[in-house]
């Protein structure tokens, strides 16, 4: 199986100032950290990628048409993302700090697609898990694999041939609920909390440094998860967080209203920055104001 080939090396999805429509494009400045530039209010321009408008369109071509970013979106829409698979405890030091045995096999759980928000979105802490300190709202910086073509029963040697690109995520977790049960999907699926940003077609530099200490690296992960089932194009895989999460710190560090959370992965992916907001719930009272 030949590796995926495309005309872009970095891809963003955005609403353009010029058209007020959603486009995909390649940032003109190859060295720009798009997420950080967005946070600093800088102008971001991209060459429009012409095709079906989807990052999954392998025949799409980078044009010379320049567009300016008004709103930065996830690199794939919710409709394009087939499944959100996640690995837990995939770094030995993180497993140790959490006082959990290092897994012998990938520790898989799923998140609902409805938990996805874009890089311009707010991390909303739902009222059901407030106050945050009691429910232990935590952050997890993770490297994300984006699958570009159907993969089933893939060997480790050919696993990278199915990778469209890599992106960053912040897997927001509520530790009180996570540690109360053996299945983590409930505690990691509240509201719109999981964040993705831009894709980079690379597996070198900082991505290697980010993943070198993984128990199950990218090749092992794709091969294992494809056995007996199909990883469809548009599937994303969160590969776990390194050590340093909030709930193991002394004192613990939990997310709260007004916090800014920044996740950085190199190799063209860059910074993911979002603000935390606690959900405000209003109740009607018999028709009187």
UniProtKB/Swiss-Prot annotation:
Q: How is it used?
A: The availability of a complete eukaryotic luciferin biosynthesis pathway provides several applications in biomedicine and bioengineering.
EC assignment? 3.7.-.-
Keyword check for Nucleus, yes or no: no
Record-listed a divalent metal cation binding positions: 140, 142, 171
Q: What does this protein do?
A: Caffeoylpyruvate hydrolase; part of the gene cluster that mediates the fungal bioluminescence cycle. Involved in the recycling of oxyluciferin, a pyruvic acid adduct of caffeic acid, to caffeic acid. The fungal bioluminescence cycle begins with the hispidin synthetase that catalyzes the formation of hispidin which is further hydroxylated by the hispidin-3-hydroxylase, yielding the fungal luciferin 3-hydroxyhispidin. The luciferase then produces an endoperoxide as a high-energy intermediate with decomposition that yields oxyluciferin (also known as caffeoylpyruvate) and light emission.
Its family remark reads: Belongs to the FAH family.
User: Gene that codes for this?
Assistant: cph
> What cofactors are annotated for this protein?
Mg(2+); Mn(2+)
Q: Which UniProt keywords apply?
A: Hydrolase, Magnesium, Metal-binding
- According to UniProt, the name of this protein is Caffeoylpyruvate hydrolase
What GO annotations for molecular function exist for this entry? Answer: acetylpyruvate hydrolase activity; metal ion binding
- Which pathway does it serve? Secondary metabolite biosynthesis
Q: Which reaction does it catalyse?
A: (E)-caffeoylpyruvate + H2O = (E)-caffeate + pyruvate + H(+)
The enzyme's main class, written as a single word, is hydrolase
Q: How does it assemble?
A: Homodimer.
